[in-house]
Amino acid sequence: MSCLEIYNKDTMKKKEGEEETRDGTVDYYGRPSIRSNSGQWVAGIVILLNQGLATLAFFGVGVNLVLFLTRVLQQNNADAANNVSKWTGTVYIFSLVGAFLSDSYWGRYKTCAIFQVIFVIGLSSLSLSSYMFLIRPRGCGDEVTPCGSHSMMEITMFYFSIYLIALGYGGYQPNIATLGADQFDEEHPKEGYSKIAFFSYFYLALNLGSLFSNTILGYFEDEGMWALGFWASTGSAIIGLILFLVGTPRYRYFKPTGNPLSRFCQVLVAATKKSSVEAPLRGREEMYDGDSEGKNASVNTGRRIVHTDEFKFLDKAAYITARDLDDKKQDSVNPWRLCPVTQVEEVKCILRLMPIWLCTIIYSVVFTQMASLFVEQGAAMNTSVSDFKIPPASMSSFDILSVALFIFLYRRVLEPVANRFKKNGSKGITELHRMGIGLVIAVIAMIAAGIVECYRLKYADKSCTHCDGSSSLSIFWQAPQYSLIGASEVFMYVGQLEFFNAQTPDGLKSFGSALCMMSMSMGNFVSSLLVTMVVKISTEDHMPGWIPRNLNKGHLDRFYFLLAALTSIDLVVYIACAKWYKPIQLEGKDEMQDMSDDDYDTESEEEREKDSKV
């Protein structure tokens, strides 16, 4: 009997070791992923390191780009801020390109690899063009030595390089986040918990990667060593690419699922063609569910989505008419006349997400000020500490440290306390709650920035012509506004990553991550538009305006207070949209979640603590 027990135990261990994932992931060769030797934190940490190195490279260019434009290319403050906003916005618009190619054709891994190569080429081009053509005389572009004029060809080469960087980083970014999440099976209790934790650590890696850029590289570039900073960024991107490729055998993969745009259009066309069709008497029972075995509930081969009652016009795409019955008998269903319920629900999911997504744009307008007006404001303050000068862009280190602190506080203090006191059936602090908290903190951050600017103007020399460091107010007074923005990011952007990834269908996960990037993109473009409008209106009657080249003659504080007011209005609209929103429901997911919760509760406290510390 004891031999039989030993045999059974060995058999069970072998089965556990060869257990396949439940979410449909495959290995590099297209075989079902084995849980024990794929994905999880081994692959997750490789992806986090890759993200940190790529972010270091990106912000090595982006963090001081506004100063490069003003000091090297001789642009004024408003034009430089607008150009940075447009460039940053373009980065995140390219995220849609990457998400589309990933979900439709290439898959997440191949898309990440290709766009990282483009990213490296763009950084190399920028480094070469800066070293050979733009930084003349050598060492120019600091606070003292002006740079010479540049030809149209040189400026064109510069813009070509930075927009190639935008394409590479933008196309890569949403897919690396989703590829990282793919390494954890959400239908497994322990891995599902790790998947939620991954998004927090992903955003932490993003910020820690930019910490080096904002401090060491920021200092070199502020001192005029622009080419050195750009070459360091290039080296970081190359190391990150090599590390990413090394992890290839360990990753879990989802196969690309076809063009999501065509699926979206098929539902709209089919619903329009059947606009005069009456609802079937038996309702949901007479709607098309795919084939008789239910395997093709959606052409994306993902999990079924539970039917909902919103946007009932779209349901007509799944109504089965006499003509559709004839087509089914001939085994030739026309996807432009008849769509499965899950395909219809995919469209509904995206439509429900849109109001929430639109409400996040104003927050991104606030966030983008760190890379533009915060830097210009800091440059006009006292940056000296003894004989050492603080690079204005390095003040964003307070933002990064704040992100790290609040991620720790949220995951180890706030979340456990909230879960302890939540009522039965309650989900505790949801992603929507966290995003709302982020908006509140953003309002406070803009008020703090406006107050600091009021005092900066009070101690400023308004008669100066070269106004860097013209105010006696220490640059460290900017620390509160940077720290508040960092705290708001933990609630808003980490919440967004989790929310859009969880609320998009299986075949649109990269698109979900791209929505978060697109929020940043639209925020940058709206910021650029807002700055342009404010400058035009405030400079009427020959007034210097709110954001002139000499900030001591302007009123940047009023612009910050305007942003605080706009964010407050956005918060009210967001609350209304969040109350209206209904989350996606996957068939069988509730039952699976209940089982997962039971399994998870049986884990020892030691195992849970170990997982939370990864």
Curated annotation (Swiss-Prot):
Q: What induces it?
A: Up-regulated slowly by nitrate. Down-regulated by cadmium and high pH. Circadian-regulation. Expression increase during the dark phase and decrease during the light phase.
Tissues with expression: High expression in roots. Barely detected in shoots. Expressed in root pericycle cells close to the xylem.
Top-level taxon in the UniProt lineage: Eukaryota
- Sites where Phosphothreonine occurs are at 111
Which GO terms fall under molecular function for this chain's record? nitrate transmembrane transporter activity; potassium:proton antiporter activity; symporter activity
Q: Which GO terms describe its cellular component?
A: plasma membrane
Q: Does the keyword Cell membrane apply?
A: yes
Chain residue ranges for the region called Disordered = 592-614
Topology in the lipid bilayer is annotated as:
Multi-pass membrane protein
Where would you find this protein in the cell? Cell membrane
Its family remark reads:
Belongs to the major facilitator superfamily. Proton-dependent oligopeptide transporter (POT/PTR) (TC 2.A.17) family.
Q: What is this protein called?
A: Protein NRT1/ PTR FAMILY 7.3
Give the originating organism.
Arabidopsis thaliana (Mouse-ear cress)
